Regions:
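Active-site mouth loops of central-metabolism enzymes
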Residues: 35-43, 92-108, 153-163
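Hydrophobic faces of well-ordered beta-strands that scaffold small-molecule active sites
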Residues: 36-40, 59-61, 88-92, 124-126, ...
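Active-site-adjacent beta->alpha loops and helix N-cap segments on the catalytic face
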Residues: 46, 66-85, 129-147, 161-166, ...
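Catalytic cores of alpha/beta
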Residues: 46-49, 101-112, 162-174, 214-229, ...
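Glycine-enriched alpha-helix->loop->beta-strand junction motifs that scaffold or abut catalytic
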Residues: 54-59, 84-86, 120-123, 146-150, ...
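Glycine-rich phosphate-binding active-site loops on the catalytic face of alpha/beta enzymes
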Residues: 60-69, 115, 119-131, 176-189, ...
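Alpha-helix-loop-beta-strand connector modules within alpha/beta enzyme cores
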Residues: 69-96, 137-156, 193-215, 260-278
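Glycine/small-residue-rich loop that forms an oxyanion/phosphate-binding "nest" at active or ligand-binding sites
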Residues: 75, 80-81, 86-140
């Protein structure tokens, strides 16, 4: 590992803004990844392994993907941080629902960032809005301060904000390295026109990373039509339980769901997306 990357973590040597610039370069160069980067949203250790083996450049680790993702357990974060050859970002979101957080929730999110840093993550994924649908700059600055020199992605809270153009400038001003967005549409493919505008407006000041509904059938097209250089997917398929005894008719919270079938990131799906975007 070169001294530049080592110095990335030395707060006594560089200030936070400079550290985040190094984080941005580190994302691109640390594992000699091609310029087009693939981030996989993973909800378990097995999914993170599948992302690694499938050739993903980075994982966004979270739980509760069915509700858009929430902060994963510290145990899961620590386990995934032991994996070599892939960068690990952690979602900081205390619950599903909107992105207007109470003071107590805000403190939880700040504490979660500190815990993630101590666990050894490479970056965090954050966001927060005001009641009027704008970026909550005061709160998000606190999250950025807690993140220190970590790489920071602003998540899809952006997709439900009031003014996309203004919000992008605010996110850049915060010092975020990356914006995960569907272009304020249900899927990234449907949001291509707005994604194009965001890439043009960003003009290299921040990475625009399309996400939502991304698969091997459309990843390359989304990248080509938007000019984006990174893309985000969950790459999931059905995982069938190995339980021999099954007690039917009892659910654990998911309505009309079979508790013996769930979604996991699939190595072959990750690999298919990766091959399409090379």
């Amino acid at each position: 590992m070169c001294c530049k990357i080592t110095c990335f973590y030395c707060k006594s040597y560089i200030n936070k803004k400079e550290a985040r610039v190094l984080a941005f370069e580190n994302d691109k160069n640390m594992y000699f990844c091609p310029m087009t980067q693939l981030e996989i949203c993973t909800g378990s250790y097995e999914s993170a392994l599948a992302a690694l083996h499938g050739g993903a450049d980075r994982v966004e680790l979270c739980s509760g993907l069915e509700e858009g993702g929430i902060t994963p357990s510290l145990g899961l974060v620590r386990a995934v941080c032991k994996l070599q050859g892939i960068r690990k970002h952690v979602l900081i979101r205390p619950r599903g629902g909107d992105f207007l957080y109470t003071p107590a929730e805000q403190e939880i999110m700040i504490d979660d960032i500190f815990a993630a840093r101590e666990a050894g993550v490479d970056g965090v994924v954050i966001g927060g809005l005001t009641a009027t649908g704008d970026i909550d700059m005061a709160f998000c600055r606190k999250l950025m301060d807690a993140a220190g020199s970590l790489s920071v992605t602003f998540h899809r809270a952006f997709d439900v904000c009031r003014d996309a153009s203004l919000a992008l400038e605010q996110i850049i001003d915060l010092g975020c390295m990356r914006l995960l967005t569907s272009g304020q549409a249900a899927t990234a493919e449907a949001g291509i026109p707005v994604l194009c505008q965001l890439v043009q407006q960003a003009a290299g000041r921040i990475t625009i990373m399309p996400g939502s509904g991304v698969g091997s059938q459309n990843a390359a097209r989304i990248l080509q039509q938007t000019g984006a250089t990174e893309i985000h997917a969950s790459a999931r398929s059905d995982f069938h339980s190995k339980m021999e005894y099954r007690h039917g008719g009892v659910g654990m919270g998911r309505k009309d769901a079979d508790e013996y079938i769930w979604k996991e990131t699939a190595e072959e799906v990750v690999r298919a997306i990766k091959q399409e975007i090379l």
